[in-house]
A protein has these predicted regions:
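A short, surface-exposed alpha-helical micro-motif characterized by mixed small hydrophobic
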Residues: 204-206
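Helix-to-loop junction immediately C-terminal to a conserved catalytic motif
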Residues: 52
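ABC ATPase "signature
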Residues: 222-223, 231
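Short coil-to-helix segment of the ABC ATPase nucleotide-binding domain corresponding to the Q-loop/switch region
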Residues: 97-104
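ABC ATPase NBD coupling module
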Residues: 13-18, 69-85, 109, 114, ...
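Conserved signature/switch motifs of ABC ATPase nucleotide-binding domains
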Residues: 136-139, 156-157, 164
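Conserved ABC ATPase "signature" region
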Residues: 67-68, 104, 108, 115-132
Length: 335
């Protein structure tokens, strides 16, 4: 659905050039929720604005739904943008217009008739659960309700892609969850491709199918949400993952699946990650019974990565031949 090929963005100034994006390549599949996470100034907002050409790349190509946006003239680009909705951290609603009229606004600009606008706006009000707020003004709404209006307005043109630029950053945790639940529902109902820019790993964990990590204008890591969470490769990614695990482990434990081998005297420390159905299986007690080993659990956590249960555990063993046999058995069963 979305392809970025060697996309670059440089801001030129007398004080010095800023290379916001450097040879960025990214493929986002149709119908998935794709997260782009990075620290402030990493280039993530520049990247998402290059997707709909709010920022014109200095170099490279941008394709959306098979069309090259970077090769279009202004008229062609205006038409192509109707397939790309966008919501922002700040809701950007028109204070003098009602909820209904805010949602209708992009359709009015396109010259669509009032009867057709009504057919589109009413279902959108129901979709974002504001069917009883159509006559309200933005000043009468909560932050979460304002963002729901923003989402409905972004969907008014029936786009294939929804870009979300820090859409939950200004919301409290409970409201954030309700907005993320809404986006997941919209993704399923409409088969909508959603791109989420965020600095919050909790957001990625909750909704994303795949994720890319951006740092200093470069994509440094990319993969499925499960892979990135359970096997982070880069220091920045590890810091993001650590921020939601709320624990500092020795460096040799910062890997996934099975990593044996932080030694502590005559003992081994092993880190195991159970994903999906295995997170609920009695694996640790099974190891004790089968291999007759003493296990000390030094860290354990049960979490959820979108729809998948996740359970990272760190275990301490007395070194013994049966421990090596046990670890080999785990590796064979997980491969």
């Amino acid at each position: 659905m979305i392809d970025l090929r060697n996309v670059e963005k440089t801001y030129y100034s007398n004080a010095g050039d800023i290379h916001a994006l450097k040879k960025t390549n990214l493929h986002i599949n149709a119908g998935e929720i794709f997260g782009i996470i990075g620290l402030s100034g990493a280039g993530k907002s520049t990247l998402i604005r290059c997707i709909n050409m709010l920022e014109v790349p200095t170099g490279g190509q941008v394709f959306v739904d098979g069309q090259e946006l970077t090769a279009m003239n202004n008229q062609e680009l205006r038409k192509a943008r109707q397939n790309i909705g966008m919501i922002f951290q700040h809701f950007n609603l028109l204070a003098s217009r009602t909820v209904y009229d805010n949602i209708a606004f992009p359709l009015e600009i396109q010259g669509i008739s009032q009867s057709e606008i009504k057919k589109r706006v009413q279902p959108l009000l129901e979709l974002v659960q504001l069917q009883d707020r159509g006559d309200y003004y933005p000043s009468q709404l909560s932050g979460g309700q304002k963002q729901r209006v923003g989402i409905a307005r972004a969907l008014a043109s029936d786009p294939k892609v929804l870009l979300c630029d820090e859409a939950t950053s200004a919301l409290d945790p409970q409201t954030t969850k309700s907005i993320l639940d809404l986006l997941k529902d919209i993704n399923k109902r409409l088969n909508l491709t959603i791109v989420m820019i965020t600095h919050q790993m909790e957001v990625v964990k909750e909704v994303c199918d795949r994720v890319a990590v951006i740092e200093n204008g470069e994509i440094i890591e990319e993969g499925s949400m499960i892979d990135v969470f359970t096997d982070p490769q880069k220091p920045t990614t590890k810091d993001f993952v650590k921020s939601i695990n709320n624990i500092e482990l020795p460096a040799l434990l910062q890997s996934s699946s099975i990593s044996a081998v932080y030694t502590e005297g005559s003992k081994l420390i092993v880190r195991l990650s159970f994903i999906g159905n295995s997170a609920g299986d009695p694996i640790v007690s099974g190891m004790v019974k089968k291999f007759d080993v003493d296990i000390n659990i030094i860290y354990g956590n049960i979490d959820r990565l979108r729809i998948y249960p996740s359970a990272p555990w760190s275990l301490r063993f007395q070194e013994a031949p049966q421990v090596s046999k046990m670890l080999c058995n785990i590796c064979m069963n997980s491969s």
